[in-house]
Amino acid sequence: MKQRFSQILSLVVRPAAFAIIMLFSPTYPLASASGSVPIVSVETIQLQSKLVNATLPYNVILPADYRTSKTTRYPVLYLLHGLGGHYSDWLTRTNVADYAAQYRMIVVMPEGNDSWYVDGAAGSNDKYESYILKELMPDVDKRYRTIQARYGRAVAGLSMGGYGAIKYGLKYPSTFAFAGSVSGAFGVTRYTEKEMGGASWEPFLKIFGPVGSETRKANDVFEITRALTPGRIASLPYFYFDCGTEDAAQHFNPNRELSGIFLEKKIPHEYRELPGNHSWAYWDQQVKEVLRIAAEKLRAPKASGKISHR
């Protein structure tokens, strides 16, 4: 029985010059200043993917003032669903639309099927990681008034989606300013038939290959983190992840392990262990925190014009 407690592990170890810049930089709150909760709008887009060879839908939560502020560009949070779920889960099983209404940012919820958000080991039509980075994100930037730069982009998710989000933050630091996870399945590349038995095993092998495969190694968040150089670490986004103390060991233990490696590597992050399990009640509660931190780390909306890419 794991002890019920709340733990926050937070570490900031940037060079002094960077710390001073952050200390004296102006803040850009994304929260609505009116005090009342505005009404957001939700759209569903059908995107034809060449990399997955399928039409993949995604939902978009637009800020309340998106239609009226014709020249404003907004930061974007990409919110990934879990295994066995779909793009609609966040909207139908949590109150994320209500929570997002407090912030002036766009929230995109893509379809990831059971892909683990990786480019699969078998088949040319399982390139979901490439789809997210090379097709989905450009499509969102084309359709909506987004801030098309690192400081205007974040990624987060639950379970399978939490794994994908943290991995993207580690692999693509120039793309995201924040990466967050709730109940992240970080140990997935170690899974055997014991964890993914029955009908799930064969599809899982097509994605990751057998234990020790190159695909598993390339998508192992522990190995990716251990291999980071000091220079690479300095470029990383801010990380947040949490896990319920009543979650299964296959989720809880890897979360604590990953935070330990982050501490060893001096990677700024926040890790929390909170009462709860692998459930929608827990995820509905914690997505509020993900939105709050994402809003803190992203740049505020800005008037349209020349967008600086950095």
Kindly give the residue locations of the regions a language model identified.
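N-terminal secretory signal peptides that target proteins for export/translocation
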Residues: 1-10
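Non-catalytic cap/lid and distal C-terminal segments of serine-dependent acyl enzymes
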Residues: 31-310
